[in-house]
């Protein structure tokens, strides 16, 4: 089957692009392997998005975007995209369910967490270490949560979880590198911080877990119930064929890529500039560029 335009990923960028393209009559195929919303689902209070003077919780904003998506008639298909490659008709997309071609494709796959080298029993690492808030099972009320990281995400996670009744400790290898506003809020909430520690070994305990870290030449131990990692992100570009990855141009003109009909939108292209407003703008601009591209193909 030959589709006109396909969107891989249903975070804010992908959904914004889908709304525009659906209203333009292009009936985009929207593929998402998980739950729509991306990292926005883990955000505590979103305050940089216009229209919400008191801020809005990430999960609430996701639901509003999903409602708008449904209202225009767009539908998200649950599928895991394993490869996007060039084809005579534009691009060939292989999912875990089918293979099809598309004339244009928007890559809105977001980012994946960077891991850190934590040693310990596999059962403890598998059951007690998480990369996103939404992965944590059950309620967090009363739980001792150790957050490893010193950026905006780590501090936002801390405020979010503390607001849900968790006992949070932030562990950073160096001085925090996040918004001063977030640091001030963490201080006001009296969230504990351990600065200058290098986590290394994790072991289970009768009451949860113990994280061993090196700090100032000494070993310290911090007890908790679970660990949440917030140590940076890396773009999800593995689904692009080697040929397409080689052909990607400098990302100074995002969402263009240098490959006709291929667009990178949102966090996957933005490095450290990960904001919902930027992602939404990228999605809409990519949708407009894709529409222009498809119109030109029709006139040839």
Regions found by a protein language model. Name each.
Residues 2-4, 78-79, 141-143, 196, ...:
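Phosphate-coordination loops involved in phosphoryl transfer and adenosine-cofactor binding
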Residues 3-72, 153-180:
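Beta1-alpha1 glycine-rich phosphate/pyrophosphate-binding loop at the start
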Residues 69-95, 99-102, 163-252, 292-300:
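A Rossmann-like FAD-binding core segment of flavoenzymes
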Residues 76-87, 91-95, 103-135:
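Glycine/small-residue-rich loop that forms an oxyanion/phosphate-binding "nest" at active or ligand-binding sites
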Residues 108-109, 115, 148, 230-231, ...:
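Short, well-ordered coil/turn residues at beta-beta hairpins
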Residues 111-152, 156-159, 164, 250-253, ...:
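Glycine-rich dinucleotide-binding loop and its adjacent helix/turn
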């Amino acid at each position: 089957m030959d589709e006109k335009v396909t969107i891989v990923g249903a975070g804010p960028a992908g959904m914004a692009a889908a709304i525009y393209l659906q209203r333009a009559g292009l009936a985009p195929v929207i593929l998402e392997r998980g739950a729509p919303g991306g990292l926005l689902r883990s955000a505590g209070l979103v305050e940089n998005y216009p229209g919400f003077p008191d801020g809005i919780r990430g999960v609430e904003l996701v639901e509003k975007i999903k409602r708008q998506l449904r209202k225009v008639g767009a539908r998200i298909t649950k599928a895991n995209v394993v490869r996007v490659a060039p084809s005579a008709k534009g691009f060939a997309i292989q999912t875990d369910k089918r293979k099809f071609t598309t004339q244009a494709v928007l890559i809105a796959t977001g980012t994946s967490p960077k891991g850190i080298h934590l040693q310990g029993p596999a059962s403890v690492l598998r059951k007690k270490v998480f990369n996103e808030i939404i992965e944590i099972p059950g309620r967090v009320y009363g739980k001792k949560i150790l957050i490893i990281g010193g950026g905006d995400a780590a501090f936002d996670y801390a405020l979010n979880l503390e607001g849900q009744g968790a006992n949070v400790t932030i562990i950073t290898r160096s001085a925090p590198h996040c918004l001063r506003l977030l640091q001030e809020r963490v201080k006001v909430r009296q969230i504990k911080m351990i600065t200058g520690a290098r986590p290394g070994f994790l072991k289970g305990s009768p009451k949860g877990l113990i994280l061993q870290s090196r700090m100032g030449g000494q070993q310290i131990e911090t007890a908790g119930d679970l660990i949440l990692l917030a140590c940076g992100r890396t773009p999800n570009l593995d689904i692009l064929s080697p040929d397409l990855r080689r052909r990607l141009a400098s990302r100074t003109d995002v969402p263009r890529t240098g490959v006709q009909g291929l667009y990178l939108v949102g966090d996957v292209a933005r490095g450290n500039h990960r904001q919902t407003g930027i992602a939404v703008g990228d999605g809409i601009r990519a949708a407009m560029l894709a529409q222009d591209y498809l119109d030109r193909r029709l006139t040839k």
